[in-house]
């Protein structure tokens, strides 16, 4: 992630959403009504405005030397760093199974579903599973907690690596669940922060 400063508002930490080494940085910034920084970005930021970026920071990045399965868990705009990790793994030619779970409250809270669905249909080692915590009128998405979906699908995570990003409560619950399924602490990677 990086610490991003916009003129006149508090600095915030945001995860990069694009692959490393690109000539630009991509950030996904959720608009939080009343949030000083996200309000500024949504209402006032213009092309050409100066932005200060400090980083990269944190420890949640793809470990390309890992050859076992990968579990990627995202909640809300936590999809940004997971997008970077998954796209980097695919672009690097990693062939192990990659299971991406994207938890959201409602269908309105989902984004990039078409993007990841296309990637999953292009790469046979990628599985993409959006999970809605509130019951949906659509039968296109699984419902329930993202942690319950993972437990239902995967009974043993021994030898896996997990990358998580999202709300702190989801990260905490996921970390407990991952350890219960046999994942070692050193194989769980997440940078936990909240940026209104």
Regions found by a protein language model. Give the residues of each.
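Conserved beta-strand elements of the Class I
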Residues: 70-72, 163
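A short, basic/flexible loop-to-alpha-helix module at the beginning of a structural domain
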Residues: 55-67
């Amino acid at each position: 992630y990086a610490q991003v400063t916009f003129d006149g508002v508090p600095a915030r930490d945001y995860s990069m959403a694009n692959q490393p080494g690109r000539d630009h940085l991509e950030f996904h910034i959720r608009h939080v009504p009343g949030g000083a920084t996200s309000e500024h970005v949504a209402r006032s930021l213009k092309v050409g405005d100066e932005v200060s970026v400090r980083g990269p920071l944190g420890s949640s990045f793809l470990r390309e030397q890992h050859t076992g399965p990968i579990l990627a868990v995202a909640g809300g705009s936590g999809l940004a760093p997971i997008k970077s990790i998954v796209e980097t793994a695919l672009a690097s030619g990693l062939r192990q199974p990659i299971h991406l779970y994207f938890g959201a409250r409602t269908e309105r809270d989902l984004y990039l579903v078409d993007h990841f669905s296309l990637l999953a249909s292009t790469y046979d080692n990628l599985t993409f599973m959006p999970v809605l915590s509130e019951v949906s009128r659509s039968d296109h998405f699984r419902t329930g907690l993202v942690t319950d979906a993972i437990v239902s699908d995967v009974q043993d995570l021994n030898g896996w690596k997990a990358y998580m990003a999202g709300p702190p409560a989801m990260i905490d619950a996921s970390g407990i669940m991952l350890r219960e399924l046999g994942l070692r602490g050193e194989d769980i990677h997440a940078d936990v922060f909240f940026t209104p």
